[in-house]
Amino acid sequence: MEEIQRYLQLDRSQQHDCLYPLIFQEYIYALAHDHGLNRSILLENPGYDNKSSLLIVKRLITRMYQQNHFFISVNDSNQDQFFGRNKNLYSQMISEGFAFIVEMTFSLRLISSLEGKEIFKSHNLRSIHSIFPFLEDNFSHLNCVLDILIPHPVHPEILVQTLRFWVKDASSLHLLRFFLHEYWNNLITLKKPSSSFSKRNQRLFFFLYNSHVCEYESIFVFLRNQSSHLRSTSFGALLERIYFYGKIERLVEVFAKDFQATLWLFKDPFIHYVRYQGKLILASKGTPLLMNKWKYYLVNFWQCYFYLWSRPGRIYINQLSNHSLDFMGYLSSVRLNPSMVRSQMLENAFLVNNVIKKFDTLLPIIPLIGSLAKAKFCNILGNPISKPVRADLSDSDIIDRFGRICRNLSHYHSGSSKKKSLYRIKYILRLSCAKTLARKHKSSVRAFLKRFGSGLLEEFLTSEEQVLSLTFPRASSTLWGVYRSRIWYLDIICINDLANHQ
């Protein structure tokens, strides 16, 4: 990270804080492709990876400004073999390179803006699991919640205009505008198999989307008092807190005139706001009538000030006591636990019924089994099946792959209140691994386990217990109690692919 900062600061100082020349630097694409910095950045290596060739990048960017020749024709005899076979390769290259440049540049600005300020910076808050302790502490005292799907911009120019306030380099903005206008259909149809944007190349769109969301997030005055729970200095693929701290100091002064009629909505001290990717949760202690006003305010707010068209039907008002939130791979709700207390005064006895609210998180077993079925670990009914593997893979490699998936799922879903569903998922993965090994050795599962022993699959059972036994080495009863309770880990920076079933 320090080497990347040094190179970016060097180039930006030479180019007067312009980002456009960085697009023609070969090492930018080497970093974007995770090739490291072990090559010289001053000389072009002819034998270097073709995908990161400086000459190819220059030729591709030149073609972007040729309006009638933006798409490379396969029948063009003047085109070399490389361009003829890879019509969409240059779009992926420029997307990765530009995303890397803006991410690292804005992260440097964020770090410099935080220097000298007394802002709590904890690496633990980079974990997405840190959201759930916040929900546990606050949501059990609230009544209503707005479950919102954030609308997407309908035109690429909206994203460019948002970035225009931060990037003063006109050439970079023109390049981004050309790129988005030509590939907007690919960006908004990311789920199509024929899309030229792979998961890796979606990071530019995610960066632009989060920068746009950050603009209207900063207007919410109530975040001024609650921002201590949301601070995160992570600068990975998603930068959601860029310039948030600088804007929050002048919120009331800038927006008081425009929102005089609606500022009373923000005076509720029990409003809490949580967002992850494209889903937003707004919870309050107020009545459903107040939340309904919030609902229509957000719709008009997005349309009038940010040109985002949202239907009121995409915003749901629910009671926390009788509704579960499908959020980040968990079903979260506030459960009412009644408790009977017997009180006696002299000769009279009383029974007092107390109700305690408890924040509950459950594992959505049906969608998760659907994800496992899609990944060919089981069928749609949850019955384990064998996965086809390469013949050159050893047994230890197969077990290690299954064990890694099982550990990741157990690690992420350790916060579930009830472990029964998690045990079922581990059982599916364990039996799927056994069937895969038996298929490789052309035998039945029973014969395979009898031959090699059931200890071959112990990795599925000992992963989590070993971690907890190191934490609580003395009392086995304490270990069992902790193992059955919710555990939130502070080292999870992304949601598991199988858990992200939405």
UniProtKB/Swiss-Prot annotation:
Gene Ontology terms, MF aspect: RNA binding
InterPro entries referenced in this protein's UniProt entry, alphabetically: Domain_X, Maturase_MatK, Maturase_MatK_N
UniProt KW keywords: Chloroplast, mRNA processing, Plastid, RNA-binding, tRNA processing
GO BP field: mRNA processing; RNA splicing; tRNA processing
A cellular component term, taken from the record's GO annotations: chloroplast
One Pfam family hit: MatK_N
Similarity comment text for this entry: Belongs to the intron maturase 2 family. MatK subfamily.
Entry protein name: Maturase K
